[in-house]
């Protein structure tokens, strides 16, 4: 059996780039909660003792940007300079302007257009991917890396590993077998965890706790064997972290947000963007399409691409590839996808309920991945029953 290795990485919520994603999405939540028609393009950057929020927002909502920044930092665990940022004493800068009237008239006619008339907020192409190798219909390498990161945060916050600090990264290499285009995981080849820690803990304690409390509960035993390689804090020291260790910026973890390097990516980030931004809404609808194709048994693996022009409601193109795993020809599956999914941005927003903010709805997406999550707020994860009678006629 010929196998190959594939690697995916993740970072947890205390990574400076992910901190920025979460702040941007917390701002989006606050705007949409009060005004579902808010037009939001919110970027965040951070460095030692500083968080800056900037971008273009047109909203009727009354938003306390500084409070959102401080609350988000505090909830992650940035409560002192020692851990990388002090939520209550860091400097917060806000540079927010209104959405360009040129964009507003072209996309939504200054809020006068009907949902089916709303154009894409920009040009671009987005990809959705699904695979039958996990219950989540996501790549195993990505699922495991993401869950390790989430578990790191869990054992930090519940006190199981009190030496942990907010920042951390994970990476998992999986050995795969290609079964006529479908991906079959064989074993976990390598597990890498680099986590921020306090001064009190030894490297031996770190390695023991990570194996016992993070790796064992996350990675199924069947994937681990005596040959599995573990790199646990291989640099030897990771005390300085968060924005003190590295600058952070919204939209720099787009592969972690999606499929861990599998499938493809059009390059657009998600966080801080309202649903007229097809970088986000377009990527969500093609994930639902790809997942529905696989979950309905039409293929074992599927990628869907959609593309847009600014101000134009209808997509320019829709593409489907099942990597040779389709039960019917790809052109038939494409026909089914087009019949069952409305790719117009205004209709995506309605069908996936993307104008609803509040309660951390989009904040939740900003750490541990936008896809493969078991949460009713992740409406794009709902599998649509696909009617294929027409396509097979």
Curated annotation (Swiss-Prot):
UniProt entry tagged with the keyword Secreted: no
Keyword Transferase: yes
E.C. number(s) listed in UniProt: 2.5.1.6
A single BP term in Gene Ontology: S-adenosylmethionine biosynthetic process
Catalysed conversion reaction: L-methionine + ATP + H2O = S-adenosyl-L-methionine + phosphate + diphosphate
Residues where Mg(2+) binds: 9
Origin: domain of life: Eukaryota
Classification via Gene3D superfamilies: 3.30.300.10
Residues that hold K(+) according to the record: 43
One GO MF term attached to the UniProt entry: methionine adenosyltransferase activity
Record InterPro entries: ADOMET_SYNTHASE_CS (IPR022631), S-AdoMet_synt_C (IPR022630), S-AdoMet_synt_central (IPR022629), S-AdoMet_synt_N (IPR022628), S-AdoMet_synthetase (IPR002133), S-AdoMet_synthetase_sfam (IPR022636)
PANTHER family: S-ADENOSYLMETHIONINE SYNTHETASE
Protein name stated in the entry: S-adenosylmethionine synthase 3
Species this protein is from: Petunia hybrida (Petunia)
């Amino acid at each position: 059996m010929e196998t190959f290795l594939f690697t995916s990485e993740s970072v947890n919520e205390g990574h400076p780039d992910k901190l920025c994603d979460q702040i941007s999405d917390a701002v989006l939540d606050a705007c949409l909660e009060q005004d579902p028609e808010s037009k939001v393009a919110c970027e965040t950057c951070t460095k030692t003792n500083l968080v800056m929020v900037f971008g273009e927002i047109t909203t009727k909502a009354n938003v306390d940007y500084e409070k959102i920044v401080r609350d988000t930092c505090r909830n992650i665990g940035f409560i002192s300079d020692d851990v990388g940022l002090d939520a209550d004493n860091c400097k917060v800068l806000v540079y927010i302007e209104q959405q360009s009237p040129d964009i507003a008239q072209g996309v939504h006619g200054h809020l006068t257009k009907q949902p089916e008339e709303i154009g894409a907020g920009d040009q671009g192409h987005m990809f959705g991917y699904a695979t039958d190798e996990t219950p989540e219909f996501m790549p195993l390498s990505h699922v495991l890396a993401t869950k390790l990161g989430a578990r790191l945060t869990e054992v930090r916050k519940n006190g199981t590993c009190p030496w942990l600090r907010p920042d951390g990264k994970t990476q998992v290499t999986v050995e795969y077998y290609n079964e006529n285009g479908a991906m079959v995981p064989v074993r976990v080849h390598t597990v890498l965890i680099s986590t921020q820690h306090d001064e009190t803990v030894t490297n031996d304690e770190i390695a023991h706790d990570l194996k016992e409390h993070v790796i064992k509960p996350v990675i199924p035993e069947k994937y681990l064997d005596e040959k599995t390689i573990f790199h646990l804090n291989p640099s030897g020291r990771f005390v300085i972290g968060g924005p003190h260790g590295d600058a952070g910026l919204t939209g720099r973890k787009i592969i972690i947000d999606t499929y861990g390097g599998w499938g493809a990516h059009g390059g657009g980030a998600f966080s801080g963007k309202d649903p007229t931004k097809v970088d986000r809404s377009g990527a969500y609808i093609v994930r639902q399409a790809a997942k529905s194709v696989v979950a309905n048994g039409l293929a074992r693996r599927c990628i869907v691409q959609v593309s847009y022009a600014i101000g134009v409601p209808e997509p320019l193109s829709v593409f489907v590839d099942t990597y040779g795993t389709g039960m019917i020809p790809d052109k038939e599956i494409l026909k089914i996808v087009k019949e069952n999914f409305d790719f117009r941005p205004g209709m995506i927003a309605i069908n996936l309920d993307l104008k609803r903010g509040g309660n951390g709805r989009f904040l939740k997406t900003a750490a541990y991945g936008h896809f493969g999550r078991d949460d009713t707020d992740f409406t794009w994860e709902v599998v649509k029953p696909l009617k294929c009678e027409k396509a097979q006629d």
